[in-house]
């Protein structure tokens, strides 16, 4: 029997204390932007990521579309219109403030990514003349080809570009380091954040991270919804590393949660209906408008808001007569809703 040698040194008996102005927990897309924003303002920043920041999180492997870019030069809708539509789609039970910020600043953040080295436009004219491309700006669009507020992008270039910008700005990145608990302190009788504890997942080294401000960007629980021991890996279509540890840490530290009583239809996590992340086709977002067949091989018809069959692929990308726009891919229940 061959003995396996752990390739990393044993640092279980080592504790290191670090201090900073801003501590960011989670190195996904949101965490990288938070760290960059703080560093741009002259703050000392530490970012903690349990994986490798250059490829971690939901955006790590890349994605093909950027939603809510309502201020791009080709858009015919306003941030207010789309933000209100997102809230209405959830029957009013959603965070309208966050949605408005998303719609008002989404394109600005995409321009930031482009300046960092991410590929946003069809600069090589690979899709020149395509129905979903604006030949003047070289921007490309998904879903609603009339209103043009969702962009097709080269998402595989984004996380590496963000990682390089973090290093350029002097952010201290602790990769392969799992945050385990939030630190708090009492000020004038009220609890305030004071940093976090973390552990190197390879060496066991323990960190005490002291910070004036702590930003929690550790995604949402995804792997906890499928209550079937035979299908533990089928956690909907989000990263299986999104296990809700940030929520657990926040709860233990006394953070207030909102809308926890809300529930939505389990389209991706209902027992027997889940699949490995993007392991099967669906028309909910990335594969939208692709022609589908049922188990018999019979084509499944697309219909518009009024029930009219859309017989060509092109028709599926435009609002129905009298319909201003439609949403796709930007809300929890990704049904095709019509305004």
Where are these regions (language model features)?
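Short hydrophobic core segments
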Residues: 23-25, 210-219
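N-terminal Rossmann-like FAD-binding beta1-loop-alpha1 element of flavoenzymes
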Residues: 22-47
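Glycine-rich loop(s) and the adjacent beta-strand/alpha-helix scaffold that form part
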Residues: 216-275
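Extreme N-terminal leader/targeting segments of oxidoreductases
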Residues: 1-22
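Glycine-rich active-site loop/strand segments that organize a redox cofactor
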Residues: 67-101
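An anion/pyrophosphate-binding glycine-rich loop and adjacent beta-alpha core
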Residues: 249, 255-337
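Glycine-rich FAD pyrophosphate-binding loop
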Residues: 40-60
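Conserved redox-cofactor binding core of oxidoreductases
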Residues: 109-210, 221-228, 268-287, 293, ...
